[in-house]
Amino acid sequence: GSVKNQVVATAKIQGTNTDVTDTSDDPNTAAANDQTIVTIDPFSVIEVTKTASVTDQGDGNIGVGDVINYIITVENKGNVTLTGLTISDTLTDGNGGGLSLSSGPSFSGANKGSGTGTLLAGETATYIAYYIITANAAATMSIVNTASATAYTQASSVVSDISDDGDDN
């Protein structure tokens, strides 16, 4: 995209009723009195962030029956709208065995009002999920959870990020 700008300045000569007018000129072109055009190159970057909190079921220790609440945010750090946004959430126990979320990830909202699957430039969408700790998962002493997000630009370029890799793409 681009932004085009042109200004017309008008002033009166002091002590007279005569107007003086001049139209702005882009100094980078040979044409006289033409618009100044600034080209804006499209770029697409998303960042996935995930936080977790545990709701203890009353025994004071993290373990079987407790709920791990996940909040996943996906921020469009680029300057183009992204569509087709999907969230993938991989959950494993301490031995690498696959686990399934008890719920989610589910779309909670976006700070600029977009619906699920769309991110405007600069917009952040929030997703929620939770996992109820099972005896088998607790026996491995840890639960590993990674979220990834994938979306598409208008030109069908793929944009993705993983919540724990430190690299926004």
Per-range role (PLM):
Residues G1-N169:
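Exported/extracytosolic protein signature
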